[in-house]
Curated annotation (Swiss-Prot):
Catalytic function, reaction form: 5-methyl-5,6,7,8-tetrahydromethanopterin + coenzyme M + 2 Na(+)(in) = 5,6,7,8-tetrahydromethanopterin + methyl-coenzyme M + 2 Na(+)(out)
Topology with respect to the bilayer: Single-pass membrane protein
Pathway of action: One-carbon metabolism; methanogenesis from CO(2); methyl-coenzyme M from 5,10-methylene-5,6,7,8-tetrahydromethanopterin: step 2/2
Family (UniProt): Belongs to the MtrB family.
Subunit-structure text: The complex is composed of 8 subunits; MtrA, MtrB, MtrC, MtrD, MtrE, MtrF, MtrG and MtrH.
Domain of life: Archaea
Spans traversing the lipid bilayer: 81-101
Identification of the protein by name: Tetrahydromethanopterin S-methyltransferase subunit B
Taxonomic source organism: Methanosarcina mazei (strain ATCC BAA-159 / DSM 3647 / Goe1 / Go1 / JCM 11833 / OCM 88)
Pfam families: MtrB
Length: 108
């Protein structure tokens, strides 16, 4: 917040952000909110990054350009891998059960 003293002898000042002209008072204190706004903007960017981390198609704050769908593609590959492993295990178990039932065909 910057203030321009128009007439120091009669304590007349102007606020440059709003353009208002007023009398300067000794009993009021004015603080600049710019450092607070900078920190709030930084926290807002971090909060947006946290929300974007939940979506695989959104870019993260500290990633290289062009890596928006990396999580999505990695999810497809890992789920495909685990699907193949579970499918092969199920098929092997089914083949083992069929083999054992054929061996025991005359016993039961």
């Amino acid at each position: 917040m910057s203030i321009v003293r128009i007439a120091p002898e009669i304590n007349l000042v102007m606020d440059t952000e709003s353009g208002t002209v007023t009398q300067e008072r000794k009993d009021s204190i004015q603080y600049s909110m710019e450092p607070v706004f900078e920190r709030v903007d930084k926290l807002d960017a971090i909060a947006d990054d946290l929300v974007n981390s939940l979506s695989p198609s959104k870019p993260l704050l500290n990633t290289w350009p062009g890596r928006e769908n990396t999580s999505y593609i990695a999810g497809i590959y890992s789920n495909s891998f685990y699907g193949i492993i579970v499918g092969l295990a199920f098929s092997g178990l089914l083949a083992l059960i069929i083999y054992i039932t054929r061996l025991m065909g005359g016993v039961v």
